[in-house]
Amino acid sequence: NTVVGRRTINGRRRPRRQTRRAQRSQPVVVVQTSRATQRRPRRRRRGNNRTRGTVPTRGAGSSETFVFSKDNLAGSSSGRITFGPSLSDCPAFSNGILKAYHEYKISMVILEFVSEASSQNSGSIAYELDPHCKLNSLSSTINKFGITKPGKAAFTASYINGKEWHDVAEDQFRILYKGNGSSSIAGSFRITIKCQFHNPKYVDEEPGPSPGPSPSPQPTPQKKYRFIVYTGVPVTRIMAQSTDDAISLYDMPSQRFRYIEDENMNWTNLDSRWYSQNSLKAIPMIIVPVPQGEWTVEISMEGYQPTSSTTDPNKDKQDGLIAYNDDLSEGWNVGIYNNVEITNNKADNTLKYGHPDMELNGCHFNQGQCLERDGDLTCHIKTTGDNASFFVGRPAVQKQSKYNYAVSYGAWTDRMMEIGMIAIALDEQGSSGSAKTKRPKRVGHSMAVSTWETINLPEKENSEEIQTSQRQDFKTPPTAGGGSDMLDVEEGGLPLSVEEEIPDFVGDNPWSNITTENSQEEEAMSSKSGLTPQLKPPGLPKPQPIRRLKSFDATPDLVEAWRPDVNPGYSKADWAVATIIAGGSIKDGRSMIDKRDKAVLDGRKSWGSSLASSLTGGTLKASAKSEKLAKLTTSERARFEQIKRQQGSVRASEFLEQILAGKDPDPKFLRDR
């Protein structure tokens, strides 16, 4: 052993660092005994806390870490990731460093799922490790990631066949995956691999391409064609009282339609309004916007008009329907609304009659009423400016009572009525428009009309009167004289005044230009629509005529059919037989029958005092007192009700008779005021 004393400078100790440097500067010879296995001497860490870089031995290999991702994974995606020369998702590995060595091995892989789905989505992505590259598709769904939250899985060398060296020409392992969600984007994979490379080799530079002909011009990128679908069930609010009354219509609201483009779905609102309206019917229209370009349009329409309640507890439950007429000149069709041209229009319409023996809410389908009116339409649309749109018109909503099959209530009640199901497909790829082929009708439907003309918008008014008719059921005998039993009301539910003279119809018939002649088919298929963009749909609706109730004389037979309880206990036939047996004269028999009829008519006085008192199967009628009360002013009616509460019904009736007779009320009726 050699002992080295500590040196001092001017009596002070030399700094340790200088001492150590002095010690290292002295040469020392160390003799070691021979050993079978020599270990590399442990290098002492330098005191200056500096790190020394490790210089790899030439030809020993290297270790690298690669990070890459697999993006745009849908919830229903499936596939496999092969690790080795086939790893195309990481070119730096497969086409880069891997070509500079003879062997490699991947010692670890980390598979992370990065979620990009919303919290409302559902589903998962299962994954499976194949260490020998023998599987082509997922065979086990034990391991999986939920698409709404991130996940992570790590595999070491023993799991991924990473303990042995592999030739750079063969793959090491695979990861297979498959999702069970929707087609929307769910997220991406972030993959980290740690690789070791062994036995480097020299890679010659690839020879450059031989000179060739000048490159041809780059082709124009292929246009991405759009495909758009609108589908929905338009609705509107109506007002109805009984099946013997006409219905009233509100303004049409915006319609909520499902909008589908390139398999992506959301909701949109389409504008709707009444195309034309009069006292008998109203034709609705749905306005459809069209993006710039040329489109082949196909529309499927199923017309069915169920009505439903708007209040609890039966809200949205069907309580009847509004039937169609069988006018062959009406049907589903399209028209120009703004900045479009419509050509090659072809519309086929069908209808389905109701069976005469079928009864709904006490009414039959014995006057040509139709339950459904369907249509199929194809056309070619070209936009000519901004904000382009066309409209879909449909069979008219009939207001007359013969088409009203909604359940009867004692007062005017709001109902929701469906217009029908409409599906509109716009295909930008098609360029030839519709083919001139006749579509087969639905089973059980009658072919109504086929047309090649679009709908014209009204330009002038027409005051031609239209004769109307009311429902005649099996138990209701037809009345003589035409319109004595026609009950019509305006929108607010009140009868029109008798003095007001209003024509029955204002405006053109929008279906007047539609023809069913086959001779015009060739010309219509090859010509453009004659409509011009200057034609605009009507703005605010014009005042329309409404029919009015002039008088009502019910026959005894009609009253007895409505209310069997007014029967006096014997029929006309019973009295005729009794007269013959007693040997009476025909004059006496007729006199007694007249008395019986008077008793039946007088029975109406006990029917009640309110129009909205009860349900009577669709045949509720007002009593005589109700007709008198309707003539009172607001203040007189309030006084009548006060007298009825304080002094009784008899005094109230006396007050009513004095007011109707034009007399001043008795002072006894004013004492409590």
Swiss-Prot record:
Region (Disordered): 1-63, 202-222, 456-490, 503-547
Entry annotated with the keyword Hydrolase: no
Bias (Basic residues) ranges: 9-23, 37-49
Gene Ontology MF: a single term: structural molecule activity
Keywords, sorted A to Z: Capsid protein, Host cell junction, Host periplasm, Virion
GO CC annotations on file: host cell periplasmic space; host cell plasmodesma; viral capsid
Residue ranges, compositional bias (Pro residues): 208-220, 535-544
Family membership noted in the UniProt record: Belongs to the luteoviruses readthrough protein family.
Name of the protein described by the UniProt record: Readthrough protein P3-RTD
